[in-house]
A protein has these predicted regions:
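Short glycine/acidic-enriched loop and turn motifs that connect beta-strands
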Residues: 24-29, 82-88, 145-150
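Repeated scaffold domains used in trafficking and secretory/extracellular systems
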Residues: 3-13, 58-68, 116-134, 180
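Long, internal scaffold/assembly segments composed of regular secondary structure
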Residues: 125-171, 176-178
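Blade-loop segments of beta-propeller domains
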Residues: 1-24, 51-57
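Beta-propeller blade signature
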Residues: 32-44, 90-106, 153-170
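Beta-propeller fold detector
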Residues: 46-54, 107-115, 165-179
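Entry beta-strands of beta-propeller and related beta-repeat scaffolds
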Residues: 15-20, 73-78, 135-140
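Eukaryote-skewed repeat-based solenoidal scaffolds used as protein-protein interaction platforms
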Residues: 60-70, 75-77, 82, 87-95, ...
Length: 180
């Protein structure tokens, strides 16, 4: 049965299965649980879960997808959300990322606030992809968006709505490049 009323996604990891659920938060409460990541054995016995509250989210998984990847004992949950209303009263949509320690199921890092492309923020992000390299040292994320051609220091960050972000698995964004 569903843990929360909105299904986000499924991931079959090396040793465990993961399901992600969510619920709407139209009251914009920072204390309301909006995402729950649930860890199961391969025979579907529940092991543990990670509850994520508020995170600037009114509607989790809105107008996009959810994908997961594991590397170095961490589970990366990459998805999207409709955010709290801005100063003009508009609820914009963007990507969001959660990093969870697989053994404790505790949240170790997150990205959900309005930011910029150098931090990996993409709005609007309609399709999210995430993959670790073979060493597990780098995490790559790709978003399908409606973005135009943006440049920073003469380098393209997003072209024709495709944005590629490279992260060190143990840190923040190290570089942004685009491949079409």
């Amino acid at each position: 049965s569903k843990e929360l009323n909105v299904f986000g996604g499924f991931y079959s990891g090396k040793d465990y299965n993961y399901l992600v659920f969510g619920q709407n938060n139209t009251a914009e409460s920072d204390s309301k649980e909006v995402v729950r990541v649930v860890k199961y054995t391969k025979s579907w016995s529940k092991v543990n879960s990670c509850s994520i509250s508020g995170v600037n989210t009114t509607k989790p998984f809105s107008a996009g997808s959810l994908r997961m990847e594991e590397a170095g004992g961490k589970l990366y949950v990459y998805t999207c959300h409709e955010m709290y209303a801005d100063s003009d009263g508009i609820n914009h949509q963007a990507n969001m990322l959660f990093t969870i320690d697989e053994s404790s199921m505790s949240l170790t890092d997150s990205m959900y606030d309005v930011s910029n492309l150098t931090d990996g923020y993409v709005s609007h992000s309609f399709n999210q992809f995430i993959k670790a390299d073979e060493s597990g040292k780098y995490i790559y994320r790709v978003d399908h968006s409606e973005s135009s051609n943006y440049t920073m220091n003469g380098s393209y960050l997003s072209v024709n709505g495709i944005t590629l972000t490279k992260y060190k698995a143990d840190g923040k964004s190290t570089a942004v490049s685009v491949s079409i």
